[in-house]
Amino acid sequence: MGQKIHPTGFRLAVTRDWNSRWFASSGDYSRMLHEDLKVRDFLKKRLAHASVGRVVIERPAKNARITLFSARPGVVIGKKGEDIELLKRELQKIMGVPVHVNIEEVRKPEVDAKLIADSIAQQLEKRIMFRRAMKRAMQNAMRLGAQGIKIMSAGRLNGAEIARTEWYREGRVPLHTLRADIDYGVSEAKTTYGIIGIKVWVYKGEMLGRNERPAVVENENEARRGRRAPRNDAGDNRGAKRPARRTGAEQAGAGDKAGTRTRKAGVDDAAAVEKEVS
């Protein structure tokens, strides 16, 4: 069901793409998979304060290309590019192949689910009330174009003895609609009372699948003209008054007059025939 399954995995090959894009034989698959996991864990610790939302790993022809989606690319690059060069060398030691690092800037971090979850986790670690942090994040997301957002926090909230789960939602979040563009992110806040988990769902609107085409929306005026019945006459009769509807008595009187005219025409025809015979 859409309520239970991972939103990204549910939409793979429909509206979402994989975060690791490479092909390997059966012998190399497990090794490369473990390398990817090590790289992601390393980047998570190394770039914890760089607001990295997503990491995409590609392996073209005995090389590796890593794309970092960050809201603070200057922190990743460092002064005169020193930090990113050091990062490349460390990644090459882990993967064993030449590594190219690309950085993509996240223009609106307020509507990125992973960055929202990380922001709430940092606030909880600073002893900010969880309700205030969640509602502030929801307001910022809705203000910057999100059509819906849902945030869930679980653990010893506010240092309570018994762990519980609380969630808030604003707008609509259709988890079971495959064409819905839903961004999902998870983060953990390490507090003095224990770990608090944060999950965020952000609904950004509907998007087309890979093989779908946009529906053709015709002009409203043309659609209205197409539904209008054709006119009987070819001339332009705009502004002309329509004949008023006749009542039942008027219609009966018109029928009597028509019958009288028919009988009179018959008498005239008979008189003309007699005159010709004589």
UniProtKB/Swiss-Prot annotation:
Ranges of biased composition (kind: Basic and acidic residues): 230-239
Tree of life domain: Bacteria
Listed GO biological process terms: translation
One GO molecular-function entry: structural constituent of ribosome
Chain spans, region Disordered: 217-278
Domain KH type-2 as annotated: residue spans: 39-107
UniProtKB keywords: Ribonucleoprotein, Ribosomal protein, RNA-binding, rRNA-binding
Residue ranges of the TM segments: none
Listed Gene3D superfamilies: 3.30.300.20, Ribosomal protein S3, C-terminal domain
Database matches in InterPro entries: KH_dom (IPR004087), KH_dom-like_a/b (IPR015946), KH_dom_type_2 (IPR004044), KH_sf_prok-type (IPR009019), Ribosomal_S3_C_sf (IPR036419), Ribosomal_uS3_bac-typ (IPR005704), Ribosomal_uS3_C (IPR001351), Ribosomal_uS3_CS (IPR018280)
GO CC annotations, alphabetized: cytosolic small ribosomal subunit
The keyword Ribosomal protein is assigned to this record: yes
Quaternary organization: Part of the 30S ribosomal subunit. Forms a tight complex with proteins S10 and S14.
PANTHER family: 30S/40S RIBOSOMAL PROTEIN S3, SMALL RIBOSOMAL SUBUNIT PROTEIN US3C
Function of the molecule: Binds the lower part of the 30S subunit head. Binds mRNA in the 70S ribosome, positioning it for translation.
Similarity-based family: Belongs to the universal ribosomal protein uS3 family.
Protein name: Small ribosomal subunit protein uS3
Organism per entry: Aromatoleum aromaticum (strain DSM 19018 / LMG 30748 / EbN1) (Azoarcus sp. (strain EbN1))
